């Protein structure tokens, strides 16, 4: 009988310890959910959550490689390729290139700047971000809006094309990840309301086929914003964007494009690969996943510009 008080005391201690541990774990999970958002219902939960840009600092070999990029073309493309990336660029308000090349550069330069916490690179990125924010019209449109006559070496037409904006959307998403600048949330909310109203009469393929084939890039940012704001109209926009995007699921499951040479633009294919998986978060139809798995089995991904079927030759 003398053992009973000891057993009871030990049991009580175990309960208290377990309860404290459970509370600590719950608090940790709450902290994680506050700082690192997973998908909001009804989107499918993701197994991994991307950390904010700059939360991990490079050292050693990785730091050396990033510094080489900073000192090389990535950090100096505005000087090496000034005709396109210099002050005449349409994404800086100039009368030069208005299409994808400027946004493409900043898509790489911005994360490099904030990962290295390099003020010189940040100062180089900021004019592009600030011009983009300031360019937004009352109806939500942003970016260059004026087509100009041909000039050798510049892309001065299709200024209203959906595709270059998808690249700049990724830039702005990364900028928010690195800085938490809340202007970006309002910026995207207004733009996506514009898209929801405009896409029915001016679909993704209106100006060029690039936006239609790469609509998954647009869709990713729509879901990203939905996870922050919970605005239901974003789910409607997600369905609309998927409907207007090239049907990669059907291509992968039912057609022979991946076995034929020169059937697909390889960059479109590389970016299209993700669209069924991105949409699966909302649609949750297993065929979206099956399509991508089948595509991975069907293709030897080697191409200069256009797909080579299952041939390893690049020429």
Predicted regions and their residues:
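Bacterial N-terminal signal peptides that target proteins for export
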Residues: 1-8
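Low-complexity intrinsically disordered segments
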Residues: 4, 14-15, 312
């Amino acid at each position: 009988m003398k053992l009973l008080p000891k057993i009871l005391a030990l049991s009580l201690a175990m309960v208290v310890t377990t309860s404290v541990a459970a509370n600590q774990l719950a608090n940790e999970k709450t902290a994680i959910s506050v700082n690192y958002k997973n998908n909001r219902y009804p989107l499918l939960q993701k197994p991994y959550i991307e950390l904010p840009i700059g939360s991990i600092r490079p050292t050693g070999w990785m730091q050396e490689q990033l510094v080489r990029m900073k000192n090389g073309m990535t950090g100096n493309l505005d000087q090496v390729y000034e005709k396109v990336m210099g002050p005449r660029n349409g994404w800086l308000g100039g009368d030069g290139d208005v299409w994808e090349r400027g946004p493409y550069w900043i898509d790489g330069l911005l994360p490099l700047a904030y990962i290295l916490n390099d003020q010189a690179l940040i100062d180089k990125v900021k004019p592009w971000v600030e011009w983009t924010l300031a360019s937004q019209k009352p109806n939500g449109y942003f970016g260059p809006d004026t087509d100009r006559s041909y000039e050798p070496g510049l892309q001065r037409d299709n200024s209203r094309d959906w595709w270059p904006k998808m690249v700049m959307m990724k830039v702005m998403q990364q900028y928010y990840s690195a800085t938490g600048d809340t202007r970006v949330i309002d910026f995207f909310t207004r733009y996506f309301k514009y898209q929801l109203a405009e896409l029915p009469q001016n679909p993704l393929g209106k100006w060029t086929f690039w936006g239609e084939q790469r609509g998954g890039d647009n869709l990713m940012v729509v879901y990203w914003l939905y996870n922050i704001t919970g605005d239901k109209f974003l789910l409607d926009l997600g369905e609309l964007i998927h409907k207007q995007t090239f049907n990669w699921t059907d291509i992968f499951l039912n057609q022979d494009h991946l076995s034929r040479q020169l059937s697909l633009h390889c960059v479109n294919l590389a970016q299209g690969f993700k669209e069924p998986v991105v949409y699966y978060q909302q649609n949750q139809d297993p065929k979206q996943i099956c399509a991508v798995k089948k595509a991975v089995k069907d293709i030897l991904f080697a191409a200069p510009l256009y797909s080579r079927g299952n041939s390893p030759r690049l020429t």
